[in-house]
Amino acid sequence: MFDFSVIDEYQIEITSYCNAACPQCPRNDLGQGINPYMPLVHLARSVIDRAFDTDLCSRLRQIFFCGSYGDPIMHPDFLGILRDFRRKNPTLWLYMHTNGGVHDPEYWAEIAGIMNGYGQIDFGIDGLEDTLHLYRKNVKYSRVMANAQAFIDAGGRAQWNFIVFRHNEHQVEQARALASSMRFHNILVRKTGRFLNHETMEEIPAWPIKNSQQVLEPPINPEYRNTSMMFLPDLKKQYTAVKDYFDTTSIRCDAMIGRKVAINAEGVVLPCNFFNHNLYDARFRDGSLPGANPLSQHNGRNQIADFLSRYGLDNLNIHNNSLAGVFENTMWADLVNSWNNEHRLFECAMTCGSKFTKVWDQGGSVR
């Protein structure tokens, strides 16, 4: 069960703003323009401070600044938010994902000082100087590397996250060597599972970029391929209709097992970031987009949005309710019960089903 007394990690998307325009990110339209369904908002420092009092912070294991749409460094008061958590618990693990492409090196050195040995930054650096911009659009390689080095030099623990595409797979070993010389704690080679046609359950060979002749392609080297994506032909042979797999697979919820939940930039407490994707991702509204997902619909409505509306998003929001109060909502128990009946949510079966685990096959590391 999702129990307030045992949840010890909160994944907080403190903003939906971002400096980048990654073509496969749900916050923009294939690398051009902002997703019109997504609200642009910062989660106020005062709201976070009120929701996470000292008693709660004293028993938490981790605060993870990550989300579906935004980069935490775009929040105008991010350093203050970090300081609030550190003041309430000197050893609370503060973890974040970022592209690292804004602010000066002094800002990043300051983050290292606030973390003070209890935290980590994962820098999303998908390539080297000649390739990073092909996916991390609007991000300047030299700035990211200077900021990462400043963080490391100030005592910060950093991990290099490298999403492998065809255009950068030849640079993985160079990146490993550079990460070592810069004293990154680790380099995580991420095996993307995003090239998926949800309707045919086949791999998309090329992902378009709006107003560009460039396309994104999955890597060729089997070492960098997502295991579940390679398993797709076998999965289709096992089921007359792939929908049958999602209707019957056992579900092992990563969030519940990991004793963690997510809070989006509007302050809504959700089981995971994948629920947040369903709320605003254009691919769940426009079937013509690559990666669009018809199985997530029920009677023309997104399943997740419809499910949450029964309980009221306002009732799940930390602007209106304490975290303890949010977990008293019957939504949490109903969600768990849904995994064992015909009214299960497709997203739960897709993300945490037993045989097709493309999300977790991408690779991930917290500590």
Each predicted region: which residue ranges?
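Conserved alpha-helical substructure of the radical SAM core
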Residues: 1-120, 134-138, 142, 196, ...
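Radical SAM enzyme [4Fe-4S]-AdoMet core and its adjacent flexible, acidic
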Residues: 5, 13, 28, 33-45, ...
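Processing junctions and N-termini across compartments
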Residues: 12, 16-19, 247, 342, ...
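Short cysteine clusters
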Residues: 18, 22-25, 253, 272, ...
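Non-transmembrane alpha-helical segments in soluble domains
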Residues: 52, 82, 149-152, 176, ...
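Cysteine/selenocysteine-centered motifs that mediate thiol-based redox chemistry or coordinate metal-sulfur cofactors
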Residues: 300-367
